[in-house]
From Swiss-Prot:
It comes from the Bacteria. This is Acetyl-coenzyme A carboxylase carboxyl transferase subunit beta. Component of the acetyl coenzyme A carboxylase (ACC) complex. Biotin carboxylase (BC) catalyzes the carboxylation of biotin on its carrier protein (BCCP) and then the CO(2) group is transferred by the transcarboxylase to acetyl-CoA to form malonyl-CoA. Binds 1 zinc ion per subunit. It is found in: Cytoplasm. A zinc finger (C4-type) spans 33-55. Acetyl-CoA carboxylase is a heterohexamer composed of biotin carboxyl carrier protein (AccB), biotin carboxylase (AccC) and two subunits each of ACCase subunit alpha (AccA) and ACCase subunit beta (AccD). The gene is accD. Zn(2+) binds at residues 33, 36, 52, 55. It catalyses: N(6)-carboxybiotinyl-L-lysyl-[protein] + acetyl-CoA = N(6)-biotinyl-L-lysyl-[protein] + malonyl-CoA. Residues 29-294 form the CoA carboxyltransferase N-terminal domain.
Amino acid sequence: MSLFDWFADRRKGQFVGKVTQESEESDGLWEKCPECGQVVYRKDLIDNCSVCSNCGHHNRIDSKERIRLISDPNTFKSINNHLTPVDPLGFKDRRAYADRLRESQAGTGLKDGVLTGTCEVNSIPMALAVMDFRFMGGSMGSVVGEKITRLIEHSTKEKLPLLIVCASGGARMQEGMLSLMQMAKISGALERHRDAQLLYMPLLTHPTTGGVTASFAMLGDLILAEPKALIGFAGRRVIEQTLREKLPDNFQTAEYLQDHGFVDTIVPRTELKETLAKILRLHKTQVVKLQTNA
C-alpha cells in the first residue's frame, strides 16, 4: 500500500481515529524505499518479505526474520548458539574489540554474527546457517567459523542438505589470523559434506564480500543469489585503482555474476521458500534413485 492509497482509504472511512503525523513517524508506520523513493506502509512491506512492491528492491533483514521466511513455523532448532566470541588479541583500533562485541550483542540480541540450526522447508529437513549483517557487518570471526563448521559436520552426520545465507563484509580483522583460518576450516568441512553426496547451497545476499566470498560462499553445488546483491572480494574502488580501469556499472552485482557463470540462479525473496522446496525435492528424489540403483 502506497502513501497515496493509505490516505485514499482514510477518506473512505476505513481508518478510524485521529493519527497525527508525529505519531505515525514515531510508530514507524511508513518506510521509504532507498532505491525508488516510494513511501510504503510498513506492514505491507513486511508482508511482502521486505521487498519494495514498486521497484522490487530487497531491503536488508535480520537473521531471525530470514529464518521465519525460509523455514516452516516452529521447526527451527538452534545448534551451538551458546558459543560466544572473546578478544584473543586484546585488539584495539579507535575502540576496543571487546567494546564493539558488547555493543553488537546489545543491539542485536545475538552472541555473534550467525544463527545455526536445523529446520524444515515444506516438511523437508535441512540444516540452516544465517549470517546477520547487523553484528559487526556480518564479519567472520572464530566463533562464526566454528558454528558454521559444526553445523556442516552435523549435517554430514545426519545426512542433511545445507543452506548458508551469506551477508558479510568478510573476515573479522580484530581477530587477525584466527579469522582467516576459518576460511580453510569451513571449506574442509564442506568438502567432507560433498564427499557424502549431500547438497550444499549458499544464498548470496547484499552484501557478500571478502573472505566469505573467497571461501564457502562460492563452494556450493547450486549458488543462489538475491536480486542486485553486491557480491565480490575486494571493493570496487580498490579494483579500479589497481587496474587503472573503469569497471562496468553493474560490476559485482548478482546479475553480472550470473551472466559470467559465477551464480547459478537469482531468486527473489518472495519466491525463495518455494524454490528451495523444489530443489530439495529434486535432490531427495535423485538420492533415492542413486541408492536404489546401487
